[in-house]
């Protein structure tokens, strides 16, 4: 698969006259304007965890590949009629990986272990605790339905059946399924390369000395970790000073090494917001004033044909925008398709009066079957991100929330995070 052409500078331009964009419309525009931007490569099943399938996966053989026993017991043919019966016990046994080579005739039984192939002529297994052995005879009392305690060939997966569709992001359990289906290699998309840039003269790297008028760069470690959990390859550009020349140089380095660029800070239109100014000067920036709290504005641009997501500098707003907007866009670029989080509709354990006009996301967690929210809605309270287990999504319209009312809870797990 060839790599798609680079984006045009006007890729993210909004229609004339649009000033405030609803969240749903912003997501729709992103889905429309972005496409998969990575090539395809083969990958061993053992190494495919987290990779995104470029082609559907077809079972190479049935599972189980032959009829086998679900229990330890004795194989026989055709089930048992009611009443006490005596069957000839054949010498030998059938064990997993050591199938019995002979033929089992009606009226005969053979020792069989769990997972072992049923011998030719057998279709039923009687539990070992339900029989008695006397000399070379098996004493058993029926009835027993034909096919009991036996697994049919292919009852789990049939050879030639589709087991995963293209775009599926593989999980550890999926690797077990593919191995069981006889697959050794699958076709996957190459990992999306995402460059991460933090801007701001006030920023210091974690662990460095900092004056009281400086702050530590919380966004870059957080965003890099999130991206790795989503199976993407991180290109860490570092902290960039607040001047146009440094920003241009950082964008050049990022565009050379990555498929997409994520920046935090400088996305607004202030005197020191050089990221948006540089993108605007190149003709490839659209400032999306999205009706969302926290998180506005979101700068979307193109640099050297590479899409740029300009996140707010505030860590809470940056995190929320990453989950709500960047994640579905990045998954689309990575080949997994545009995805929405799975919402849980649960009772609220809080009260709130919300004004109309924008969608709101509150840091929240589930306790005793109800959803509670962080004590402060202030986006400066970074600790609330770790306190929370997800986000409450409040609709664009005005709302009065009271305890017990059903609300929409988006757990972090629905965004691919623990």
List each language-model region with its residue ranges.
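Helix-rich terminal scaffold detector
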Residues: 1-11, 15-24, 184-311, 315-318
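Flexible glycine/proline-rich
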Residues: 17, 24-27, 41-46, 55, ...
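Intrinsically disordered, low-complexity, positively charged segments
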Residues: 17-85
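Residue-level signal for inorganic ion chemistry
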Residues: 30, 73, 160, 196, ...
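Short glycine-rich, flexible loops that bind phosphorylated cofactors or substrates
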Residues: 119, 172, 269-271, 416
């Amino acid at each position: 698969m060839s790599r798609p052409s680079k984006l045009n500078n006007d890729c993210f331009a909004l229609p004339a006259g649009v000033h405030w964009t609803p969240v749903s419309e912003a997501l729709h525009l992103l889905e429309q304007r972005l496409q998969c931007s990575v090539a395809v490569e083969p990958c061993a099943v053992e190494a495919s965890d987290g990779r995104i399938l470029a082609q559907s996966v077809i079972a190479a053989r049935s599972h189980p590949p032959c009829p086998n026993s679900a229990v330890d017991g004795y194989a026989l043919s055709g089930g048992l009629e009611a009443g006490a019966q005596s069957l000839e016990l054949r010498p030998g046994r059938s064990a997993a990986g050591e199938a019995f080579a002979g033929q089992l005739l009606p009226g005969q039984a053979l020792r069989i272990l769990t997972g072992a192939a049923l011998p030719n002529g057998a279709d039923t297994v009687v539990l070992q605790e339900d029989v008695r052995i006397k000399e070379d005879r098996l004493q058993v009392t029926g009835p027993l339905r034909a096919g009991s305690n036996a697994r049919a060939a292919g009852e789990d997966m049939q050879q030639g059946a589709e087991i995963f569709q293209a775009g599926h992001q593989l999980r550890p359990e999926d690797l077990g399924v593919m191995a069981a289906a006889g697959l050794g290699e699958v076709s996957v998309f190459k990992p999306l390369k995402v460059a991460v840039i933090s801007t701001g003269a006030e920023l210091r790297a974690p662990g460095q000395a900092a004056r009281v008028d400086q702050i530590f760069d919380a966004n870059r470690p957080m965003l890099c970790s999130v991206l790795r959990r989503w199976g993407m390859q991180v290109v860490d550009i570092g902290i960039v000073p607040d001047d146009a020349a440094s920003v241009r140089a950082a964008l050049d380095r990022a565009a050379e090494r990555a498929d997409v660029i994520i920046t935090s800070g400088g996305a607004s239109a202030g005197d020191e917001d050089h990221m948006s100014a540089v993108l605007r000067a190149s003709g490839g920036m659209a400032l999306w004033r999205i009706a969302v709290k926290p998180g506005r504005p979101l700068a979307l641009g193109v640099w050297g044909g590479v899409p740029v997501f300009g996140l707010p500098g505030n860590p809470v707003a940056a995190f929320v925008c990453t989950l709500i907007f960047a994640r579905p866009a990045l998954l689309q670029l990575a080949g997994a398709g545009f995805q929405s989080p799975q919402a849980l509709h649960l009772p609220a354990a809080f009260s709130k009066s919300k004004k109309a006009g924008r969608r709101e996301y509150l840091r929240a967690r589930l306790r005793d079957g109800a959803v509670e929210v962080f004590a402060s809605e202030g986006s400066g309270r970074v600790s609330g991100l770790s306190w929370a287990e997800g986000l409450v999504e409040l609709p664009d319209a005005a709302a009065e929330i009271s305890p017990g009312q059903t609300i929409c809870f988006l757990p972090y797990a629905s965004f691919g995070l623990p």
